[in-house]
């Protein structure tokens, strides 16, 4: 039985999950929900099913794998990663994984907060002003390692890739001062399974956010 990944028909919080499912050659199907247009942004496609799936904390995204029913995007990533030993091996690697799992969510949410804000155009300049310092921390944390936890890829590389790629879409030149981050992106996109997925009709890089967002809704 293939796993079922449920989410809106956008990139959003499912991008890293989809990438990890593809990288691990997992058998899965997607259940994509469509949100209505403005002004109502009808969510009935999801709400009609929300409490009928046996989820403990009903939300999107969700992953159903037989008896295992999981919500929360990072919990889903961890579940898939544990199956494939992609959580780090040494204590040092696991610490780095734990830090990045949370740091990437912070940065994802920070971008989301301004992109959904009606005052987006006013907030954007300050966000861009502060962005290099945020990216510098990632650059220094990666250093000369091939992957963020160490010599082997882990699930947080999928999260970091998502955050860096989002910011590359937001401001195309934002990574120019950080060659090791650009190299990391090239390395990640060069992975055989990832490269094949990005060329397939299943790949969904946009819309980044839902129809309610001011930026990234197309």
Curated annotation (Swiss-Prot):
Residues 2-88 form the GST N-terminal domain. PROSITE patterns: GST_CTER (PS50405), GST_NTER (PS50404). It catalyses: RX + glutathione = an S-substituted glutathione + a halide anion + H(+); prostaglandin A2 + glutathione = prostaglandin A2-S-(R)-glutathione; prostaglandin J2 + glutathione = prostaglandin J2-S-(R)-glutathione; prostaglandin J2 + glutathione = prostaglandin J2-S-(S)-glutathione. Keywords: Cytoplasm, Lipid metabolism, Phosphoprotein, Transferase. One of its GO terms (cellular component) is cytosol. Changing residue 108 to Q: Reduces catalytic activity by half. Residues 90-208 form the GST C-terminal domain. GO terms for biological process: cellular detoxification of nitrogen compound; glutathione derivative biosynthetic process; glutathione metabolic process; hepoxilin biosynthetic process; nitrobenzene metabolic process; prostaglandin metabolic process; xenobiotic catabolic process. Substrate binds at residue 116. Glutathione binds at residues 7-8, 43-46, 50, 59-60, 72-73. Liver (at protein level). Belongs to the GST superfamily. Mu family. This is Glutathione S-transferase Mu 1. It comes from Homo sapiens (Human). The lineage of its organism: Eukaryota, Metazoa, Chordata, Craniata, Vertebrata.
């Amino acid at each position: 039985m293939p796993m079922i990944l449920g989410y809106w028909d956008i990139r959003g919080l499912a991008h890293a999950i989809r990438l990890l499912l593809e990288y691990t050659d997992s058998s899965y199907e997607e259940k994509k929900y469509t949100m209505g247009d403005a002004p109502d942004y009808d969510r009935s496609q999801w709400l009609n099913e929300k409490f009928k799936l046996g989820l403990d904390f009903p939300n999107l995204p969700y992953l159903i794998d037989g008896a295992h029913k999981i919500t929360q995007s990072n919990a889903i990533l961890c579940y898939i990663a544990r199956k494939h030993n992609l959580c780090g091996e040494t204590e040092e690697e696991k610490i780095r994984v734990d830090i990045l799992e949370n740091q990437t969510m912070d940065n994802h949410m920070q971008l989301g907060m301004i992109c959904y804000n009606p005052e987006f155009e006013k907030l954007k300049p300050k966000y861009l002003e502060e962005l290099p310092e945020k990216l510098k921390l990632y650059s220094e944390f990666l250093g000369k390692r091939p992957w963020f936890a160490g010599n082997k890829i882990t699930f947080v590389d999928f999260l970091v890739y998502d955050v860096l790629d989002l910011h590359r879409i937001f401001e195309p030149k934002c990574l120019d001062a950080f060659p090791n981050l650009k190299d990391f992106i090239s390395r990640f996109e060069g992975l055989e399974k990832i490269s094949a997925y990005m060329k397939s009709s299943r790949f969904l890089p946009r819309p980044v956010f839902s129809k309610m967002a001011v930026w990234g809704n197309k």
